[in-house]
């Protein structure tokens, strides 16, 4: 029984096949089926997806389907010139692809396609022997060149003789011309003059008035031309056979290249699909969790993302809700995504999605049921369910749509509960949809099951297609009837006919839905506030770094000035020592006086500055020669600990002076004034050429403002603009690193860049 078909697996594969380069890739995609070890395929898809994001499309020259040519080689046939050209271009493309992967950092791609064999000698031989238009070149062999040279010389001789014949026999010719037919030069002789020239008649005109004659003097020449043509044909056949034999001698290598390119084409198609559907690679996990999963058969403008998680201590979901509310799509998506992941396909969902490997995936979605149509009968359902129950075990993922429908509700519900119990006892993981109340109640009381429902908007009388976990769904019949104007008296009469338990259950479900709606609204508000908080936090972190950098630069300047002064004093001391060693007493005395005078001047200056205003904790001060204003934390033994906002320094009191009032205010303003520079640019809608100067200017602005991180919004689209931006950043030496944004930063629609500051 083909459960994959009921999950729309073949339809999704058909979508992916549209992105393949050739039939090689399309045939390979048809071979992909769920396996318990899909790691190799998934890792290759992931690496190629990363390759696309950073480098754009890999080189794909000439990677066409040459399966027919390979079969002809295997059968012993010599390939025609155009076939050899086609194979040569293919093999040249293999070489280019292999070399490209060898210089990249993707280990799985490099390892897999390192097995591509080089046919450089064959490619060179084909290029030497065959022209691009398919003609065999004179360079193909010395014998071929010799034959063609002789043939050309002989043809020239025949044409010269033919021109002479026309000129000297004009009276017997119907027209002053000759023709070349079947490798022979013939003359249109009047039938009445047939015997005027000895020769062979090859053709007669339809009117009988003209015979096409080959004069005896041309027979030998024409025979020699025909012989040369036959020799040329044989030599060309020999050359083609020789080229084909190169392929035949390396048939295993050739077939392996075809297989590897088929696999590459399949990977290429899957990556193009992922980029088109904003997909990601999901690797096998120990749990089931869908994050914004989007069914690929639903148009992008209509699809509602599915968010669903099966806790580790649960083994199944019972999903209820109104018809056409999205129940079937939800369970189908779980089964489909599991099958696709196990087959090596990327999935249209967000990061954080997790799926388990199930050796058995079984589903009952009804006969030929599609997402748009829900037609089934009880008997057809039951036939599939019987098969599923027989084969189910702990390795099984079971998808059952509208279990218990198509028959009496009471009996259907009882049967549904019994089937669910049996599947759980066998250890299967189950996803079941139903609208039967007893099944909802059963799920509420079973420790291994979770209820879920499809959200319904009572105001618009339509489903929202959002999954609500933890609460069963209602039919909403009374709400819909009341909204559409049915007499309240009739509605109350209908309610009174429900049992007390049914009324309590409906009331409980309605209350739970209302509470969940409120919680969802609160969750959205909190998420929005969190995003705003993260933006503010990042902004203030950038401001902090900028101000800290400014402070450090100021202190560096002051430190340089201090070092200059120390060097000056040291130089003068060195001079004094030199004088002491070599100079006269008068010179020594003069040097000592100079040093003592400078010492006294320096001490006096320090005393004046220190005594002018006593430095104490809490004072705002500046360093000698500096502009930064700091606050004194403590003073001990003539040294003050000064807080300059983002840096604390111990400074001699003699090197400090009190700051003026306006300097204090300015310092305060500078310390806490956030930058007004925007750390993001939006280049959506631009070409790569238009975006390049904008991106470079943005990097300039980041560095001028002392900001290390910025955001470039380019959108997702085809990925061409993103690839262009990455190429610009890769070449810019001011860029430290760049990456796609996290989901909260905008995902692959945003590039986060870090620059040197």
Swiss-Prot record:
Gene designation per UniProt: mutS2
Chain residues that bind ATP: 321-328
ATP-binding in keyword set: yes
Domain Smr: 681-756
Subunit structure: Homodimer. Binds to stalled ribosomes, contacting rRNA.
E.C. number: 3.1.-.-, 3.6.4.-
GO biological process terms on file: mismatch repair; negative regulation of DNA recombination; rescue of stalled ribosome
One Pfam short name: MSSS
Molecular-function annotations in GO: ATP binding; ATP hydrolysis activity; ATP-dependent DNA damage sensor activity; endonuclease activity; mismatched DNA binding; ribosomal large subunit binding; rRNA binding
Function summary: Endonuclease that is involved in the suppression of homologous recombination and thus may have a key role in the control of bacterial genetic diversity.
This protein's name: Endonuclease MutS2
Keyword flag ATP-binding: yes
Gene3D superfamilies: 1.10.1420.10, 3.30.1370.110, P-loop containing nucleotide triphosphate hydrolases
Enzyme class label: hydrolase
Disulfide bonds: none
Family note: Belongs to the DNA mismatch repair MutS family. MutS2 subfamily.
Alphabetical UniProt keywords: ATP-binding, DNA-binding, Endonuclease, Hydrolase, Nuclease, Nucleotide-binding, RNA-binding, rRNA-binding
